[in-house]
Regions:
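Short alpha-helical Gxxx[C/S/T] motif in the catalytic ATP-binding
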Residues: 135, 139
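Conserved glycine-rich
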Residues: 147-148
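Short helix-loop "hinge" at the ATP-lid/N-box region of the Bergerat-fold HATPase_c
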Residues: 77-79
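Acidic ATP/Mg2+-coordinating residue in the GHKL
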Residues: 105
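Short beta-strand/loop element within the Bergerat-fold HATPase_c
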Residues: 85-97
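Conserved catalytic submotifs in the C-terminal HATPase_c
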Residues: 48-58, 95-96
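Short conserved segment of the HATPase_c
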Residues: 98, 110-122
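Detector for a conserved hydrophobic position within an alpha-helical segment of the HATPase_c
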Residues: 142-144
């Protein structure tokens, strides 16, 4: 990637809006910028990151900066979890009147005993100095602030985080 492309991606990724009310946000640019910013981390593991956004996906009602923080945390965690030459898949599509974003990886999975605690503040499975244990707590809070929900499904060899967000009202009319 050229330097100008990386700078552009970082600017898009760090878009910390100061909006006081939720507004229509397109999901695809935020996901694309997040993946561009994390591309070098993926390269270090020879990991592949794929993205598949449904054509004509409506905008969601939310806060762009917060949504980008959500994508950054989920995709970064997925890259931490995958083995060498692992795979992280990101999809976004419309389901049941909402936009659903999935971040899936082929890492070892999250044991059930740990899964119950992953959204707890200060809970981490990472080595000392490698994480604060706040990432998924913050993700859950930001998703709630954007009127969304998050679920995790994990088994050995696969973990999926599923984020549902409301479609912007004017996007609903445009469909």
């Amino acid at each position: 990637m050229h330097i100008s492309g990386l700078v552009s991606a970082i600017k898009g990724f760090t878009h910390m809006d100061q909006a006081m009310v939720a507004e229509p946000v397109e999901i695809a640019p935020g996901l694309g910028n997040t993946i561009a910013v994390l591309r070098s981390k993926a390269s270090k593991k020879s990991a592949a990151v794929s993205i598949d956004v449904e054509n004509g996906l409506p905008s969601v009602r939310g806060f762009a900066g917060e949504l980008n923080q959500i994508w950054g945390n989920l995709i970064d965690n997925a890259l931490d979890a995958v083995p060498e030459k692992g795979l992280v898949e990101v999809t976004a599509k419309r389901e049941r009147g909402r936009v659903v974003v999935r971040v899936m990886d082929n890492g070892p999975g999250i044991p059930a005993s740990v899964r119950e605690r992953i959204f707890d503040p200060f809970f981490t499975t990472k080595a000392m100095g490698q994480g604060t244990g706040l990432g998924l707590d913050i993700v859950r809070r930001l998703i709630r602030h954007n009127d969304g929900s998050i679920e995790v499904d994990s088994r050995p060899g696969r973990t999926e985080f599923r984020v549902e967000l409301p479609i912007a009202e004017d996007a609903e009319v445009a469909q």
